[in-house]
């Protein structure tokens, strides 16, 4: 069902199946990612209700954006020391196939 929905929404032409965001709850390098989640996650999820968007918190992990596509292909973008706006641009690039 999520795969069918992803085929109609963002990243549809690329076969996007899932977005994962890894971050640390406390590190300064993850602050922009935490800000992004607080300010923009709800809007992103409302616009894409059937696309799995997973948030994974882990102590001392480097913040990273993962996108999983059809046939198990994955791309990742490091988000260390990014601002919330830079995280937004990184997500847009992944969704458009530029990353």
From Swiss-Prot:
PANTHER family found in the cross-reference section: NADH DEHYDROGENASE [UBIQUINONE] 1 ALPHA SUBCOMPLEX SUBUNIT 2 (PTHR12878:SF0), NADH-UBIQUINONE OXIDOREDUCTASE B8 SUBUNIT (PTHR12878)
Membrane topology: Peripheral membrane protein
Subunit structure and binding partners: Complex I is composed of 45 different subunits.
Native organism: Macaca fascicularis
Keyword Magnesium: no
Disulfide bonds: 24-58
Gene3D superfamilies documented for this protein: Glutaredoxin
Family, as annotated: Belongs to the complex I NDUFA2 subunit family.
Location in the cell: Mitochondrion inner membrane
N-acetylalanine sites (modified residues): 2
Alphabetic keyword roster: Acetylation, Disulfide bond, Electron transport, Membrane, Mitochondrion, Mitochondrion inner membrane, Respiratory chain, Transport
A Pfam family assignment: L51_S25_CI-B8
Role according to the record: Accessory subunit of the mitochondrial membrane respiratory chain NADH dehydrogenase (Complex I), that is believed not to be involved in catalysis. Complex I functions in the transfer of electrons from NADH to the respiratory chain. The immediate electron acceptor for the enzyme is believed to be ubiquinone.
InterPro entries per record: NADH_Ub_cplx-1_asu_su-2, Ribosomal_mL43/mS25/NADH_DH, Thioredoxin-like_sf
The keyword Aminoacyl-tRNA synthetase is assigned to this record: no
Modification sites for N6-acetyllysine: 64, 75
Residue positions, PTM N6-succinyllysine: 64
Name of the protein in question: NADH dehydrogenase [ubiquinone] 1 alpha subcomplex subunit 2
Cellular component annotations (GO), alphabetically ordered: mitochondrial inner membrane; respiratory chain complex I
GO biological process: blastocyst hatching
């Amino acid at each position: 069902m999520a795969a069918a929905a992803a085929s109609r929404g963002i990243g549809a032409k690329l076969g996007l199946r899932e977005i994962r965001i890894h971050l640390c709850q406390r590190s300064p390098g993850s602050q922009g990612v935490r800000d992004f989640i607080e300010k923009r996650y709800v809007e992103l999820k409302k616009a894409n209700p059937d696309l799995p968007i997973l948030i994974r918190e882990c102590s001392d992990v480097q913040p990273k954006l993962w996108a999983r596509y059809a046939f198990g292909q994955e791309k990742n973008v490091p988000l260390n020391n990014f601002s919330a706006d830079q995280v937004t641009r990184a997500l847009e690039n992944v969704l458009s196939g530029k990353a």
